């Protein structure tokens, strides 16, 4: 007793449908995971900025790394204190590629796209920062949406 051609075609069709559903679900899971990592990177960067500013209030200088470039970690350097919040926030943001990488493009030569300009980051996982007259503005693009955080001058830590 053997299977008929129709029975085999039905089994193949069912396997195809299950595979298609699995691929769609997997893509959704990975997109959600990348977005979560991106948002965690943003949160970590905000904490690092406040931490470095606080350290600079109590020390003559703080150790900060230069920007991660060409697959090479930044070098340690001393940033003299006191500095204004915008300078510390900018230097901390530039050095952030030493601590995190883009979940959307994990093999970048600079780990994470970091731009010092007033607009939104052009790619997912990218960071844009700019010291403005109203304060320091930080932006990060995660899954097509830009997250914005601004420290108003009146509320600098």
Question: How should these model regions be labeled?
Answer:
Residues 1-27:
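N-terminal single-pass transmembrane signal-anchor helix
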Residues 17-25, 69, 125-131:
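Short, low-complexity cationic-aromatic patches
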Residues 43, 47-79:
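Alpha-helix exit/C-cap motif
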Residues 66-128:
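Surface-exposed intrinsically disordered loops and tails
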């Amino acid at each position: 007793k053997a299977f008929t051609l129709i029975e085999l075609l039905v089994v193949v069709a069912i396997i195809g449908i299950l595979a298609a559903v699995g691929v769609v679900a997997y893509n959704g899971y990975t997109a959600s995971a990348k977005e979560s990592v991106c948002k965690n990177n943003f949160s970590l960067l905000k904490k690092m900025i406040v931490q470095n500013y606080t350290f600079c209030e109590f020390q003559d200088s703080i150790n900060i790394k230069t920007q991660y470039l060409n697959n090479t970690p930044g070098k340690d350097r001393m940033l003299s204190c006191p500095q204004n919040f915008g300078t510390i926030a900018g230097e901390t943001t530039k050095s952030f590629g030493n601590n995190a990488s883009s979940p959307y493009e994990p093999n970048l030569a600079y780990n994470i796209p970091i731009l010092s300009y007033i607009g939104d980051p052009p790619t997912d996982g990218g960071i844009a920062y700019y010291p403005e007259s109203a304060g320091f503005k930080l932006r990060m693009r995660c899954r097509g949406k830009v997250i914005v955080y601004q420290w108003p001058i009146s509320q600098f830590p």
